[in-house]
């Protein structure tokens, strides 16, 4: 049987991959292998690998990258990548996968792909060809594309960009975004169930906010998040759910400042490491807008007909739905954006990332595509 190894480094990413992982696990022609790494294994981030196990998956290997005791700087991130390369080498020796499946543009996936390249393990990559100009994730994503052998893009424009990068057109598949398909399949919680699970009231006026470091910005993450929090002071009648930043450099100062704000606004605000996909999608049915700079605000949130206030440059360059409102980093720009978001209301939105049958399309390729000599690639020149 073909051994498909899925690597996941965070709860958000795992939420996207979970349905596909189950399909692989349940297929009699495939064997699922799971590697958990980085944020999943961090105590600061809640040791979310336990959720993978609760869902009935076996974690075949754990690769420790995060150092919870280290300072929040570039040195720590770079060393995490080096630990990842070493750990993935051991994992690949132990598991001997036939195909590696990875998603996105996180630095832990750069460690995975670099190691797999040396081991001559074919890579199937999801969400290549996208643009996010404000973060070094953008360069990592394109680098992973060049180290990958099968490509599953979320739009036709991104499929063309992967081909533009020299990938052979018969190996690049526009399948849509798994996250959007997951919205359609989600078992939604009731408002009361969400409130009980969070010990937090979802009033008629609610925001959901996630703010990540903008790793290529000259403005400090602290200044950015303080500007956002000052803008939110104009909305004292709104309840706000904040979720944690990712593990990029400067994430800890963002988390610290939001914690302070939530402590000063007890009852009106709450802060949680992660809602988990089911509860996150369920909460989106009861909030007025999503704020911050997460890719989820661009990809999945439009399916709920509510606005996304996309702050700054982190997601700059992505294809967006009509419900996405862009604004700059200053408090005044965020205030103007919030006014537009509040006025937006609820509308039926065409989500550019939706395509029917995403999981089935990926499964068909990873089951049937010939893997013999696939690691030797030819640069595809556009005529």
Predicted regions and their residues:
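Nucleotide-activated sugar donor-binding and catalytic core shared by glycosyltransferases
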Residues: 1-383
């Amino acid at each position: 049987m073909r051994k498909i190894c899925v690597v996941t480094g965070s709860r958000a990413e795992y939420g996207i991959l979970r349905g596909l992982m189950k399909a692989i696990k349940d297929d009699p022609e495939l064997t699922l292998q799971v590697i958990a790494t980085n944020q999943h294994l961090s105590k600061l981030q809640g040791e979310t690998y336990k959720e993978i196990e609760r869902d009935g998956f076996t974690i075949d290997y754990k690769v420790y990258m995060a150092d919870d005791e280290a300072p929040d700087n570039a040195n720590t991130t770079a060393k995490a990548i080096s630990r990842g390369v070493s750990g993935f080498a051991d994992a690949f020796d132990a598991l001997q996968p036939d195909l590696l499946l990875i998603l996105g543009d996180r630095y832990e996936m750069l460690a995975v792909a670099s190691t797999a390249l040396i081991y001559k393990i074919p890579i199937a990559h999801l969400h290549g060809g996208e643009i996010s100009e404000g973060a070094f994730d953008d360069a990592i994503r394109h680098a992973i594309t060049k180290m990958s052998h099968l490509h599953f893009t979320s739009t036709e424009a991104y499929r063309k960009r992967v081909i533009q990068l020299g990938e052979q057109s018969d190996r690049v598949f526009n399948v849509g975004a798994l996250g959007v398909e997951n919205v359609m399949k989600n078992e939604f919680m009731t408002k009361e169930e969400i409130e009980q699970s969070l010990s937090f009231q979802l009033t008629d006026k609610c925001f959901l906010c996630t703010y990540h470091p903008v790793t290529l910005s000259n403005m400090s993450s602290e200044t950015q998040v303080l500007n956002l929090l000052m803008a939110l002071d104009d909305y004292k009648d709104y309840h706000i759910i904040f979720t944690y930043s990712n593990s990029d450099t400067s994430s800890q100062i963002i988390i610290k400042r939001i914690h302070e704000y939530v402590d000063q606004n007890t009852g009106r605000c709450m802060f949680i490491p992660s809602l988990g996909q089911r509860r996150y999608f369920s909460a989106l049915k009861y909030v007025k807008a999503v704020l911050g700079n997460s890719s989820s605000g661009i990809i999945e949130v439009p399916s709920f007909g509510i606005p996304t206030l996309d702050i700054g440059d982190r997601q700059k360059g992505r294809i967006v739905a009509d419900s996405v409102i862009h604004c700059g980093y200053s408090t005044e720009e965020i205030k103007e954006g919030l006014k537009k978001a509040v006025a937006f209301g609820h509308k039926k939105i065409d989500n550019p990332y939706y395509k029917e049958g995403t999981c089935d399309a990926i499964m068909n390729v990873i089951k049937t595509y010939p893997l013999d000599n696939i690691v030797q690639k030819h640069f595809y020149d556009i005529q």
